[in-house]
A protein has these predicted regions:
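Non-catalytic connector elements of ABC transporters
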Residues: 2-4, 263-325
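ABC-family P-loop ATPase nucleotide-binding domain
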Residues: 1-27, 320-325
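ABC transporter nucleotide-binding domain
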Residues: 187-280
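ABC transporter nucleotide-binding domains
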Residues: 18-23, 28-226
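A generic structural signal for secondary-structure junctions
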Residues: 96, 122, 235-239, 264, ...
């Protein structure tokens, strides 16, 4: 008989008040490559925490060490108040893990797959409940090999949830999905948050982090370079908007300091012949920019504006676009 006893009731009194995850001084090398370089972070119980950064930043290595799948070279990792060498079996029963690439047996059906994963846990949720939760009820008898990419990702999430975990690791959960599938998966993660589960996810989609995460750590070259809520990190720019424009020839005659001297413009960066301006007031900055271009006889090829995002925070910290990092 399947037990659906809430995980909160299974947590020992010794765990009360402890963070879901604590990482101190984490280091990992692969030959001459430093994947993780003295990384520290703490995830509170019930928090959705995001590790953000480009491919190769060290996100996946960090999360695999936290999941007990990879050994670190140095540092301390405590998961739900315990270390992996204390009692790995008991700890693994309390976790849900969705890998960046989850290879499921393609000849099994959806129901058979979830039932298989349910058998790994002494307690958990019912197979039917989890299948319905990830909106695969109509596909319960379909073989995994016949599912779409988005459906396979939802099935992988079901396998991570079926043990009713206290802490769930999601590594790049929406990579490769179309926009509709991404949003469907976002809705499922939001439901998990509402249930009080602790979630650690990695992503290089800044909009995903802004939508889902209570706090984020921006990781670059194996280090945390910024930590906080999405709102506070964006506010740290000191600019509410970003103006991006291209003007042929401007990169040869304009300097960043000259643009920063214009009314309403806080900072200016040139990247691949395109300027990005952090501005405090669009109504002042855009007219000032247009006047300056006209004064210099420079043509305006394109101009777009958007509210400041975590992507802009990353660019401000590193001088690189996330997609180019």
């Amino acid at each position: 008989m399947t037990s659906t006893t809430p995980r909160a009731a299974l947590t020992t009194s010794a765990d009360a008040g402890r963070p879901a995850l604590r990482v101190v001084g984490l280091r990992k090398r692969y030959g001459d490559v430093v994947a993780v370089d003295g990384l520290d972070l703490t995830v509170a119980s019930g928090e959705c925490f995001g590790l953000l950064g480009p491919n190769g930043a060290g996100k996946t290595t960090t999360i695999e060490i936290c999941e007990g799948l990879t050994a670190s070279d140095d540092g301390t990792v405590e998961v739900l108040g315990r270390r992996w060498d204390d009692d790995e079996h008991a700890l693994r029963e309390r976790l849900g893990i969705q890998l960046q690439e989850t290879q499921l047996a393609e000849k099994l059906t959806v129901e058979e797959t979830v039932r298989l994963f349910r058998s790994f846990y002494p307690r958990g949720r019912s197979v039917d409940e989890v299948i319905d939760l990830v909106q695969l009820g109509e596909k319960r008898n379909a073989r995994v090999g016949k599912l779409s990419g988005g459906q396979k990702q939802r099935l992988a999430l079901a396998c991570a949830m079926v043990g009713d975990p206290e802490l769930i690791f999601l590594d790049e959960p929406t990579t490769g999905l179309d926009p509709q599938s991404r949003r469907q998966l976002w809705d499922l993660i939001i439901e998990l948050k509402a249930s009080g589960r602790s979630i650690v996810l990695t992503t290089h989609y800044m909009d995903e982090a802004e939508k889902l995460c209570d706090r984020v750590a921006i990781v670059d070259h194996g280090r945390v370079i910024a930590l906080g809520t999405p709102r506070t990190l964006i506010a740290s720019l000191g600019a509410e908007h970003v103006v991006e424009f291209s003007s042929p020839g401007s990169e040869e005659v304009l300097r960043a300091e000259e643009l920063e001297a214009l009314d309403g413009i806080q900072s200016a960066r040139l990247h691949n012949e395109e300027w990005a301006l952090e501005v405090t007031e669009l109504a002042r900055a855009v007219p000032a920019l247009l006047r300056e271009l006209a004064r210099r006889g420079l043509p305006l090829e394109e101009l777009v504006t958007h509210s400041a995002t975590l992507e802009d925070v990353f660019v401000s910290l590193t001088g690189r676009q996330l997609r180019d990092a």
